[in-house]
Swiss-Prot record:
InterPro entries: Nitroreductase, Nitroreductase-like, Nitroreductase_HadB/RutE, RutE-like
This protein's UniProt keywords: Flavoprotein, FMN, NAD, NADP, Oxidoreductase
Cofactor(s), by name: FMN
EC number: 1.1.1.298
UniProt catalytic activity: 3-hydroxypropanoate + NADP(+) = 3-oxopropanoate + NADPH + H(+)
Name listed for the protein in its UniProt record: Probable malonic semialdehyde reductase RutE
Gene encoding the protein: rutE
PANTHER family, A to Z: MALONIC SEMIALDEHYDE REDUCTASE RUTE-RELATED (PTHR43543:SF1)
Domain of life: Bacteria
Keyword Acetylation: no
GO molecular function: 3-hydroxypropionate dehydrogenase (NADP+) activity
Species whose genome carries this gene: Escherichia coli O127:H6 (strain E2348/69 / EPEC)
Length: 196
């Protein structure tokens, strides 16, 4: 049986963690980005399909390439973040299933149903984005996930000619807590959950 993590870890991962819009000028190393992936890759996905593909943008040139895709409300926070991750999904993720899920012919589940393949890729890459956020928090980083961007522009600018399609953006760095908004409420258990 697993042991519960400490109250401090729960605070870091959930109750005290915030979505950041402002950033300190502390850089995030490439080694730290590798550590993030080394943690997040272990999160579960359907049939271990692991459809997420991530581009970590950490240069001024990369940010300028991304700039035209950003909504006005997400522009400044993204340009000043040390790293912006494009979380994409591979529309042909199933080509890796013989390696990732060698328990029967899982590849055929998706090659025979393009709709199932797309739904699976999008849903599971979204879950993997959440794992990325938790991995960042576990390593002492802050994040700012965003869906306010022109996905078609990002796909054309970063993934043209490939099987990748963008899902969401996540700013990564060390947040400036002085720029946080007041914490917003969440739904109660009674409002969000049911017991049968």
């Amino acid at each position: 049986m697993n042991e519960a993590v400490s109250p401090g870890a729960l605070s870091t991962l959930f109750t005290d963690a915030r979505t950041h819009n402002g950033w300190r000028e502390t850089p995030v190393s490439d080694e730290t980005l590798r550590e993030i992936y080394a943690l997040m890759k272990w999160g579960p996905t359907s049939a271990n399909c692991s459809p997420a593909r991530i581009v970590f943008i950490r240069t001024a040139e990369g940010k300028e390439r991304l700039r035209p895709a950003l909504s006005s409300g997400n522009l400044q926070k993204t340009l000043t973040a040390p790293v912006t991750a494009i979380v994409a999904w591979d529309s042909e993720f199933y080509e890796r299933l013989p390696q990732l899920f060698p328990h029967g012919d899982a590849r055929s589940w998706f090659t025979s149903s393009p709709q199932l393949a797309e739904e699976t890729a999008f849903r599971n890459s979204s879950m993997q984005a959440a794992y990325l956020i938790v991995a960042c928090r576990a390593l002492g980083l802050d994040t700012g996930p965003m869906s306010g961007f022109d996905r078609q522009y990002v796909d054309d600018a970063f993934f043209a000619g490939s099987t990748l399609k963008s899902n969401l953006l996540i700013n990564i760095g060390y947040g400036d807590s002085s720029k946080l908004f007041a914490r917003l409420p969440r739904l109660s258990f009674e409002e969000a959950c049911g017991l049968l």
